[in-house]
A protein has these predicted regions:
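Short, cysteine/histidine-rich loop/knuckle motifs that typically chelate Zn2+
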Residues: 40
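Bacterial N-terminal signal peptides that target proteins for export
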Residues: 1-11
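Boundary at the C-terminal end of the N-terminal hydrophobic targeting segment
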Residues: 22-24
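Extracytoplasmic electron-transfer domains, predominantly the class I c-type cytochrome c fold
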Residues: 55-102
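Gly/Gly-Pro-rich "capping" loops immediately C-terminal to redox-active cysteine motifs
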Residues: 27, 31, 35, 43-72
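Short alpha-helical segments used as structural interaction elements across diverse proteins
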Residues: 1-2, 28, 72, 80
Length: 102
């Protein structure tokens, strides 16, 4: 029993580190997706280049549903719908990049 108790914190730490590395990898891959689909309007560092596009650094970090709807359906007159152009995996990678702060 004492060995199990000692092993649990080590296991938890290992899982946390593995999860953090996976998120970092996703953010890196998300940057590639961002550069392919988003950088023209939203700018290199998620800040527009003087246009009317939304500053993505200010996007709520806890609202994936809103992010997904905005990307897939478009937003207003400036943001085109990307449904059918970005995959579900690309969308998740973009979200990881957004979460990382660029």
């Amino acid at each position: 029993m004492p060995r199990r108790r000692a092993a649990l914190p080590a296991l938890a730490l290992g899982l946390t580190l593995a999860s953090s590395l996976a998120l970092a990898d996703d953010a890196e891959l998300g940057r590639d997706v961002y550069e392919e689909f988003c950088v023209t309007c939203h700018g290199k560092d998620m800040v527009n280049s003087g246009g009317v596009t939304f500053d993505l650094r200010k996007f709520p970090k806890d609202d994936f549903a809103r992010f997904q709807a905005s990307v897939l359906n478009g937003k207003g007159q400036g943001m085109p719908p990307w449904r059918g152009k970005v995959s579900d995996d690309d969308l998740k990678l973009l979200w990881a990049y957004l979460q990382s702060g660029g």
